[in-house]
């Protein structure tokens, strides 16, 4: 449980800092060495905040500028293929 507490405190500290921070040495040296880090000149370590979640898909502009009757014709796409529903 002690490691979990340390992790929570670190997360809080990291949130108070800017999104990109240069570090003197890696927080987890074992993991850094597995990724190719060596403690000698020429290696720099940064902590970078990464946004969580999936890919943000851009909203098509067409839906903003279409009149409401036409908007009914446009249906959300399924598996990337756009489906048009025509009123009769």
Swiss-Prot record:
Molecular function as annotated in GO: mRNA binding; structural constituent of ribosome
PROSITE patterns per the UniProt record, alphabetical: RIBOSOMAL_L15E (PS01194)
Cellular component, GO annotation: ribonucleoprotein complex; ribosome
Lineage: Eukaryota, Viridiplantae, Streptophyta, Embryophyta, Tracheophyta
Keyword line: Ribonucleoprotein, Ribosomal protein
Organism, as annotated: Brassica napus
Family: Belongs to the eukaryotic ribosomal protein eL15 family.
Signal peptide positions (record): none
Top-level taxon of origin: Eukaryota
SMART domains to which the protein is assigned, alphabetical: Ribosomal_L15e
Keyword Phosphoprotein listed: no
TM helices/strands, residue ranges: none
InterPro entries cross-referenced by the UniProt entry: Rbsml_eL15_core_dom_sf, Ribosomal_eL15, Ribosomal_eL15_CS, Ribosomal_uL23/eL15/eS24_sf
Official protein name in the record: Large ribosomal subunit protein eL15
Pfam families, per the entry: Ribosomal_L15e
Biological process according to GO: translation
